[in-house]
Amino acid sequence: MKLVKKQKENVTVILLESTLGLEENIKMLLAHEYTHWIREKEIKHDIFEMCIGERFITEGIACSFSEEIVPNKQTSYYTIVPNTTVEWVENNIETIDKVVETELDKNNMMYDFFYMFAKTRIPNMPVRTGYVYGYLKVKEYMRKNNLKIKDIVKLDWREVLNR
């Protein structure tokens, strides 16, 4: 899954071999990418690199919509990380909250939270935790406000993170 700029037009490239040809994996992946397409189209800024707050919520929305389309899987399935990463984020969410509190409107921690081979600043933090953190924040916001993805897909990230 990669967003590529081609002559001022965004093109999403989806590598279907990563789905192992399984219909539910394809549905999950397409649902995830669809929310990215809708969000970027409606918000009209770079949802991936503008700032870490935007990226958390963008990925959280995408993972949550995947869950709506392919229900009853573990969080690790939607966030595409090992179960141990999900557990680490759940056990350390307050630490993450404190670390990112003053960084949400910047993009200098993007690598720490979203890339496979990151050298993270939080001790023992697994890579790609941003997907889980965003997912948990989006799920919490939707639960508290009795909302669905369709209600928040265009919402400003600051609203979801109470900024």
Q: Model-predicted segments: where are they?
A:
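Active-site scaffold of zinc-dependent metalloenzymes
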Residues: 1-23
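An acidic intrinsically disordered interaction segment
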Residues: 20-36, 86-108
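Active-site recognition of the HExxH zinc-binding catalytic motif
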Residues: 28-41, 59, 63
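Hydrophobic/aromatic-lined pockets within catalytic cores
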Residues: 35, 39-43, 66-74, 138, ...
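Membrane-interface helix caps and helix-loop-helix hairpins in membrane proteins
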Residues: 45-47
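Post-HExxH zinc-binding segment in Zn-dependent metallohydrolases
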Residues: 50-87, 91
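Pan-zinc metallopeptidase signature
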Residues: 95-163
